[in-house]
């Protein structure tokens, strides 16, 4: 039984050293079961990789400092290290391309904000001055037009004011004007007859003086 087990281990291990098993009697079932139970466990245990051994050695050297030249990395650990170095190189190459932005409370941002506020204030002042200038210009033009109209209307007021006043505006005004004119004529006639009847000598003397003055001139 031990011979068969040894041949199986030689076929599986491909040159690996097999543990020595004590000789047991074939009649003992318990002794035969123990090697069979322990054999699969030892056969299934994986052999540690050389890269794992190298990593342990590197950690030991970093902690305690081991003398001697560093060992060459194994082929299994090589691609991962190369990949990590390439990734670091890309990150370092990308860092300068990122634009530097100022912090929210930095003096650069405060100066930019002050410049923007000053620009807005100047634009507001320019618009306000422009509006005031336009308003003053419109007021000045309005005053000039009103002054011209007053100058044109003033001569007409004195020259044709009486004529416009005497012109009747409607039929009632015409009736009033006629009544006043007839009443004036009637009152004048009565006054003349009263003067001649009461002061005829005085009236004759006044008429003679007017005639002499007219003839003398």
From Swiss-Prot:
InterPro entries xref list: TMEM247
Provide the topology term for how it sits in the membrane. Multi-pass membrane protein
Which cystines does this chain contain?
none
Keywords per UniProt: Coiled coil, Membrane, Transmembrane, Transmembrane helix
Q: Where is the composition biased (Basic and acidic residues)?
A: 1-10
Q: Where is this region: Disordered?
A: 1-87
Annotated compartments: Membrane
* Major location category of this protein: membrane
Q: Which Pfam families match?
A: TMEM247 (PF15444)
TM annotation in the entry:
165-185, 192-212
- List the residue ranges forming a coiled coil, or say none: 109-154
Keyword Membrane assigned: yes
Q: Which GO terms describe its cellular component?
A: endoplasmic reticulum; membrane
What's the name of the protein? Transmembrane protein 247
Q: Which species does the entry assign this protein to?
A: Bos taurus
* Lineage, opening ranks: Eukaryota, Metazoa, Chordata, Craniata, Vertebrata
Gene giving rise to this polypeptide: TMEM247
């Amino acid at each position: 039984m031990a011979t068969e087990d040894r041949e199986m281990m030689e076929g599986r291990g491909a040159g690996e050293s097999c543990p020595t098993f004590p000789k047991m009697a074939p009649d003992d079932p318990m002794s035969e079961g123990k090697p069979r139970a322990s054999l699969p466990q030892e056969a299934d245990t994986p052999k540690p990789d050389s890269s794992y051994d190298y990593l342990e050695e590197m950690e030991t050297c970093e902690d305690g400092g081991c003398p001697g030249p560093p060992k060459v990395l194994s082929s299994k650990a090589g691609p991962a290290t190369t990949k990590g170095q390439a990734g670091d190189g890309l990150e370092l190459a990308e860092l300068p391309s990122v634009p530097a932005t100022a912090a929210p409370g930095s003096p650069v941002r405060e100066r930019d904000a002050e410049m923007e506020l000053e620009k807005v204030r100047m634009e507001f002042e320019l618009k306000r001055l422009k509006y005031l200038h336009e308003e003053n210009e419109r007021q000045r033009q309005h005053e000039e037009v009103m002054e011209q109209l007053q100058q044109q209307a003033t001569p007409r007021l004195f020259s044709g004011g009486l004529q416009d006043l005497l012109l009747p505006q409607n039929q009632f005004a015409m009736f009033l004007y006629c009544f006043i004119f007839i009443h004036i004529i009637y009152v004048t006639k009565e006054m003349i007859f009263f003067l001649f009847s009461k002061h005829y000598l005085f009236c004759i003397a006044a008429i003679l003086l007017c005639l002499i003055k007219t003839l003398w001139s």
